Structures are given as C-alpha cells and as structure tokens.
C-alpha cells in the first residue's frame, strides 16, 4: 500500500476539458495531514505511518489523545488514519502530507461513508420488482417468498430483506484526478464520491486488481 491523504468532500461541479466537453467532478479539500506516528516491525510488528486530519478545539479530545498528538507536535485533530508502507525511512514525525503527492491524470481509490437512508424497503434497498398494482392484487411492495417450508424451516442468513440502508464504508476505485491545487489544498476528481458534502474521505493511489 502507498501513502494517501484525508480530506473533506465539498461538493460537485463541472469543468471543461481541452475539447470543450463538460466533465463532472467532485471537489475535495484534502490535507495537509501531519504524520503523528511511524510504526516499524521492531515496535509494532509492521511498517506504517499514521496521519491526522481535521483541526478541532483541544477540549474536544481526551487526555490520551492530546498526549499522542503532542509527541509529534501536532495541533488537536479529530481523525487518525494509517497507511501501510514497505519503507518509512523517507518520513518523519510532524511531516505534512499534502495534495501534491497526486498529479492530474492519475487514478485514485476513494473511500468514504455512504449517505444513510434509514429503514428502507425491498424496492429501494435491493431493486426488487413490485407486484401488480391493479385487479384486486394485495401484493404491491411485498418481498414474495423468503424460503422453503418445513425444510429447512428457517430463513437462510444473507436473505435480502428490508432494513437499514446506507451509512456503510464504500470504496470507489480507479477515479481520475483532473486537477490539483496545492495552494488551496484542493483536488478535483472525476465522478461522484461517497457521502454528503462535508463527509470525510480517504484518497489513495489506485490499487490495480485484476485486469486494468
């Protein structure tokens, strides 16, 4: 895994490429993320760096959290994330990770939390087909059969049913970076990202899985 950055989703807009075509993009306010801890095989059993993001008031953190951040002389920050690396010799405590680690045209993976929809039914949550809407039908939005009868005499785990929808971790892979603005700590990514405006997102270089 390679080092990434944390940011806040600001919202969506559009830009125009060299051919004049409209490109939908999401604007992310990313970093700077100071390094708060460097983990090594001798002390932790693996190699990684921990970064912080999102300044808060000191009273919003517990005493152990403040003590942990003070070791790297980092101001009070809300979020901590780890990025596993093969070699951490190029990093040191307090070093800031900024958006200039990315470049236009690069592919990235973005991880965030999807918008919570609350308790949702079968059609909205799983795209079930509805029943007849006329001719005396009483099955409009019912699920249909949930299993067999006496044998097995139960509903198998994993059966798609109504329940809470959204508010889960979502990773969208291989999105293209359109522009990077180091002065304003902005990164423009093609397409939609998970979560509402103001949501926390993690951006890492794309991990190639299977065919490109």
UniProtKB/Swiss-Prot annotation:
Keyword Ribosomal protein: yes
GO cellular component: cytosolic large ribosomal subunit
Region (Disordered): 127-161
Record bears the keyword RNA-binding: yes
InterPro entries assigned: Ribosomal_uL3, Ribosomal_uL3_bac/org-type, Ribosomal_uL3_CS, Transl_B-barrel_sf
UniProt GO MF annotations: rRNA binding; structural constituent of ribosome
GO BP annotations, alphabetical order: translation
Keyword annotations: Ribonucleoprotein, Ribosomal protein, RNA-binding, rRNA-binding
Pfam families (UniProt xref): Ribosomal_L3
Main function: One of the primary rRNA binding proteins, it binds directly near the 3'-end of the 23S rRNA, where it nucleates assembly of the 50S subunit.
Family the UniProt entry places it in: Belongs to the universal ribosomal protein uL3 family.
Subunit structure: Part of the 50S ribosomal subunit. Forms a cluster with proteins L14 and L19.
Protein known as: Large ribosomal subunit protein uL3
Gene (UniProt): rplC
